[in-house]
Curated annotation (Swiss-Prot):
The keyword Transmembrane helix does not apply. Expressed by the venom gland. This is Natriuretic peptide TNP-b. Disulfide bonds join C9-C25. Pfam families: ANP (PF00212).
Amino acid sequence: SDPKIGDGCFGLPLDHIGSVSGLGCNRPVQNRPKK
């Protein structure tokens, strides 16, 4: 769970989910790690 792939911790758009909030900060809640 790298905080640079798609955790949304930094407000980055998760893979193709589209969540830009700190919801899955190192926590695969709804933004499960694609890799």
